[in-house]
């Protein structure tokens, strides 16, 4: 007898404001970034928080919490005239496996929906998402 099929991954819906807040970061420069979370009751991706335009990198790293997952769009400022838009998947290695699966599926949905992302990056440990790593990804190496 074969093993029962595991349930199919849950499809996470995007709340209407997900795209709007993304445009507020990317085009309107209203925020420097936005944190997306999944409301498990409604199974919907929602806005958890926004970053003001003058926030520093340390404020971003405070969102990388143990036992949690989230998705962040963050405008990393390289200089006064240059920035790169990062799509960040945070899935703490200590987060529940069900959350990791849920956010991994949501990551795919968001990545398809949000157009104009410069760089995608993922981490399970804070050491994988340091400012040095962001700089290396944002600034192309000179030949």
Curated annotation (Swiss-Prot):
It comes from the Eukaryota. GO terms for cellular component: actin cytoskeleton; cytoplasm; nuclear matrix. Residues 10-139 form the ADF-H domain. One of its GO terms (molecular function) is actin filament binding. Keywords: Actin-binding, Cytoplasm, Cytoskeleton, Nucleus. Pfam families: Cofilin_ADF (PF00241). SMART domains: ADF. It is found in: Nucleus matrix; Cytoplasm, Cytoskeleton. InterPro entries: ADF-H (IPR002108), ADF-H/Gelsolin-like_dom_sf (IPR029006), ADF/Cofilin (IPR017904). GO terms for biological process: actin filament depolymerization; actin filament severing. Controls reversibly actin polymerization and depolymerization in a pH-sensitive manner. It has the ability to bind G- and F-actin in a 1:1 ratio of cofilin to actin. It is the major component of intranuclear and cytoplasmic actin rods. Cofilin-2 may play a distinct role from that of cofilin-1 in destabilization of the actin cytoskeleton during Dictyostelium development. PANTHER family: COFILIN-RELATED. Belongs to the actin-binding proteins ADF family. This is Cofilin-2. It comes from Dictyostelium discoideum (Social amoeba). The lineage of its organism: Eukaryota, Amoebozoa, Evosea, Eumycetozoa, Dictyostelia. The gene is cofC-1.
């Amino acid at each position: 007898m074969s093993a029962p099929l595991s349930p199919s991954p849950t499809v996470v819906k995007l709340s209407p404001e997900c795209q709007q807040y993304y445009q507020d970061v990317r085009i309107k420069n209203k925020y420097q970034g936005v944190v997306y979370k999944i409301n498990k009751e409604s199974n919907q991706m929602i806005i958890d928080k926004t970053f003001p335009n003058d926030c520093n990198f340390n404020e971003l790293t405070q969102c990388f919490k143990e036992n949690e997952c989230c998705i962040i769009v963050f405008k990393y400022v390289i200089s006064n005239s240059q920035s790169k838009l990062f799509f960040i998947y945070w899935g703490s290695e200590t987060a529940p496996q069900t959350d990791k699966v849920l956010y991994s599926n949501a990551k795919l949905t968001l990545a398809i929906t949000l157009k104009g992302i410069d760089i995608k990056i993922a981490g399970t440990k804070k050491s994988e998402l340091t400012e040095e790593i962001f700089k290396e990804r944002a600034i192309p190496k000179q030949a």
